[in-house]
Amino acid sequence: MNKQEPRIITTEDGSHSVYLPELNESYHSSHGAYRESIHVFLLYGLEAWYARNRGKFPIRIFEVGFGTGLNAWLTLIWAEQNQVPVLYHTIEPHPLSEKIYEALNFTQMDETLTHYNGYFKRLHKMDWDIGKPLTDYFNIKKEKITLQDVQLYPTDIVYFDAFSPKKQPELWEKPLLEKIETSMNPGANFVTYCAAGHLKKNLLSLDLTLDDVPGPPGKKEMTRAWKKS
């Protein structure tokens, strides 16, 4: 195997992540990929927005970094279980190979979710750049494109799951954050695993309001910002 090829690693909660030798970076926290996604994006992103906006749907989500597909799959499950329609727009300039995504073990992490296992591969196998419903409550558009080039739609929740500022600094600077902020609906939130001071400063400069929220296991902090209603 080429030493520069992505490879699967196991994180502390037993779930897989993908390590990229080229960047010396993994797609998820080494402390637990599965629980990080649930904590940052489902609990403090989707659930928090929904608690403030019950009855308002469809929920429009924009994700920076489809990656392993874990956030999308967990959101699909949430939409089905809550019977709330979700429009999910995600970008990924460098999709994983079939060899990698078929070996990921996320569908084995919770035996109560086995009904949804088939959707994980369907998320990866579906065509790029074409939006379509995957279930009665989950419509997704995956685009093989960069944040710089994507055309954004109005959004209620932003899952900002890019590689770290040390690896992709341009994604965390004000010009691209402002592009996202402009697309956010009043009352929308922005969540990410990153808690860097310069990120928070940039978000505040865009007139977003920051929360003090705890990080996922293994991390003291994360970042959540709200757009004023």
Regions found by a protein language model. Name each.
Residues M1-I59, I77-D110:
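Rossmann-like AdoMet
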Residues F62-V64:
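Conserved beta-strand/loop positions that form the S-adenosyl-L-methionine
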Residues G69-W73:
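Glycine-rich SAM-binding Motif I of class I
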Residues D156-L171:
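A short SAM/SAH-binding and catalytic strip from SAM-dependent methyltransferases
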Residues I157-Y159, M184-C194:
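Conserved beta-strand signature within the Rossmann-like core of class I S-adenosyl-L-methionine
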Residues E170-P186:
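A short glycine-rich, Lys/Arg-flanked "PGG" loop and its adjoining helix->strand segment in the class I
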Residues A196-S229:
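Class I S-adenosyl-L-methionine
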